[in-house]
């Protein structure tokens, strides 16, 4: 498949055939993830494949996964990981202050996200489906306990990968001109927002499954109605970060 066509046809898969991925295919996925760009080559991530049925069930419950975690061909947790760098600094009797700050944490988040998306693109190129699972952050303390995460790590999201048992319709993105800026930032006009709301209202009303009375603004108002996952700051402090 043409790469652009593949990217433009992306949808999240939430129903998987129960076939597990072969060791060879899983190794290819990991190699693909590692090939992504990394800031200063710090490679500030770890990828944990969760196979234990009890752990999968616990993650499914806290993430509200409805089957697309435990039924996937493989389930990975992508961890922003500065612990390995703390090991190096400690081994060489160097202070950890530069590792604990916001910039280092952002680097680890970016590195981890690039690795995950590179895996996702490769997975879809060989006919697999994927679904990012941000719901693992619903209980960061529980995730850290389940995965025995050390200091200077953060479980960023999960990634379910497997053989699709069904495919959702592609959601219309914002028009390119709404996200492309030249030389300076340009806020969206009310007309641009209204036009996209109408596009999304038509999409939600007309899709073949789970039709809804919704548009983009309604979705965003619901999403940002109140602060979410407010334990994140406390968890970051527990993990040794100092912002």
What are these language model-derived features?
Residues 1-243:
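Acidic, surface-exposed loops and disordered segments
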């Amino acid at each position: 498949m043409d790469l652009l066509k593949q990217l433009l046809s992306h949808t999240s898969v939430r129903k998987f055939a129960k076939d597990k991925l072969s060791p060879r295919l899983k190794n290819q996925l990991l190699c693909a993830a590692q090939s992504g760009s990394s800031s200063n080559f710090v490679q500030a991530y770890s990828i944990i494949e969760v196979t234990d049925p009890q752990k999968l069930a616990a993650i499914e419950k806290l993430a509200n996964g409805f089957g697309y975690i435990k039924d996937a061909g493989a389930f990975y947790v992508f961890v922003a990981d500065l612990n390995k760098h703390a090991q190096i600094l400690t081994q060489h009797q160097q202070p950890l202050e530069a590792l604990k700050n916001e910039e280092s944490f952002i680097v680890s988040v970016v590195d981890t996200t690039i690795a995950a998306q590179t895996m996702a693109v490769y997975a879809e190129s060989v006919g697999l489906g994927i679904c990012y699972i941000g719901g693992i952050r619903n209980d960061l303390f529980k995730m850290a306990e389940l995965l025995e995460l050390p200091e200077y790590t953060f479980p960023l999201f999960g990634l379910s990968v497997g053989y699709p048992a069904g495919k959702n319709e592609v959601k219309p993105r914002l028009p390119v001109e709404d996200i492309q800026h030249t030389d300076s930032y340009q806020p969206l006009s009310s007309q641009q927002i209204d036009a996209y709301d109408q596009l999304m209202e038509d999409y939600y009303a007309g899709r073949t499954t789970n039709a809804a009375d919704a548009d983009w603004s309604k979705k965003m108002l619901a999403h940002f109605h109140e602060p979410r996952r407010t334990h994140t700051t406390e968890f970051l402090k527990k993990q040794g970060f100092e912002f």
